[in-house]
Amino acid sequence: MKNSVFKSVLVSALLATAAACSAPATDSADAGETTEAVAATGYYADLGGEATGPVYRKAKADTLAVSGYDVVSYFTGEGVPAEGSEEFTIRYEGYDYRFASEDNAKAFIEDPAKYAPAYGGYCAWAIGANDALAPGDPQVYEIVDGKLYLNFNEDVQGRWQADIPGFIEKADVNYPTHNADEHYQD
C-alpha cells in the first residue's frame, strides 16, 4: 500500500514538474510576452538509473530506445506497437523512451521494468542462441510471461519460437555478461 501511494505521489510530482517546465513563461522585461518553454518537449521525466546491460539503438551515440516505439502500446489495446511521440519522452537508465500518449507515459513511470524490452531491445534469439548482440526489430516481437521480447526478423523469430523457454534461459545467462556500453556493429 505504501509503495503504491509513493508511486502515485511520484507520478504527480513528475507530471507537475513537466507541466511547469513546458508551460509558457512570462518575462517581466517583455511585458507579459511568452518565451520558449524550458523543456524541449511537452512531457519529459528522467527516472534516473543506469543501464545494467546494453540497450539497442540505431547508432551508438543515439539514446533513443526501441527505435522510438511506445513500449506500453505492445501491452494495451490491440497489442499493436505504436510509434511514440517526442512530446511524451521518458528517460530511463540513460535512454529515451517515447510514448504515443500521456496515459502510456504515466504507465511507464509507474513500472518501467514491466514495459522495457528484455535484453535492452536486442534480438532475444541472438543473445540466447549465440551470445551475440543483434538489432531487435520493434515490429517482430512476442510477449512471454508479461515481458516484451524483440527479434531480428520473422525468420529469426520462427527459430526463437521453436524453443522459447530454452532461448530465454540461455539469454538470461548471456545478456548480463555484456557491458552496458556495448553496441551492435554491422
Question: What feature does the model see in each segment?
Answer:
Residues M1-L10:
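Bacterial N-terminal signal peptides that target proteins for export
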Residues T17-A20:
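C-terminal motif of bacterial Sec signal peptides marking the signal peptidase cleavage site
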Residues S22-P24:
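Bacterial signal peptide processing site
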Residues D30-V72:
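N-terminal low-complexity, Pro/Thr/Ser-rich intrinsically disordered segments
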Residues G79-V80, E87-F88, N130, Q139-V140, ...:
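N-terminal secretory/targeting leader peptides
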Residues E86-A124:
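Mid-length scaffold segments of soluble, non-membrane domains
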Residues R98-F99, L150-F152:
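Hydrophobic core segments of beta-strands in well-ordered, beta-rich domains
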Residues Q161-D186:
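C-terminal partner/receptor-binding element of secreted or periplasmic proteins
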